Amino acid sequence: MDTRDVRRFNRYYTRILGVFDQKVFDLNYSMIEMRILGEIGRHPGITANELTNCLNIKKSYLSRKLSKLEGGGYISKKKKPDDSRSMHLFLSEKGLELNKYVEEQSDQKVLELLAPLDEANYQELVTAMKTIEKILYRVVPNELESGQ
């Protein structure tokens, strides 16, 4: 198996995504912090363990990021009734507002990036992305999306 094409595509796609990375939309938060906020927003009550699996990051790293977001008033933690060591994570009002802003800005950036494409090229791109996701899901399933 020759990995050069896969690695080339990864470098190219990562460079495209880099447009969104530098201090996300002039906020004092990183892309991973905004991803954490987004996952909590999409999955209210998610646990830290579920987040580490979903984002493929270490628990200690996630813990630091959650502390920053909690300290900023963007998230809240609630103990699970059956396990006091495990916490459910939720967005606060402030977190909901920031998440909405970032989602809107992200949508706008994608629209700007893809504006040169006509409808046929756009549909071809989306179909190709879905194909890539379907194939890669066989090796790295997304636990949250699969309902696990």
What do these predicted ranges mean?
Residues G38, K100, V126:
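A cross-family signal for key residues in well-ordered alpha-helices
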Residues D21-Y61, L66, G72:
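N-terminal helix-turn-helix DNA-binding core of bacterial DNA-binding proteins
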Residues L17, P44, N99, E133-L136:
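A structural signal for well-ordered alpha-helices, especially hydrophobic packing surfaces
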Residues M1-M31:
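N-terminal leader segment of winged-helix/HTH proteins
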Residues E104-Q148:
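Terminal interaction helix/tail motif
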Residues N10, L17, L55, N99, ...:
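Short amphipathic alpha-helical/adjacent loop interface patches that line ligand
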Residues S67-Q123:
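Charged, amphipathic alpha-helical coiled-coil/dimerization segments
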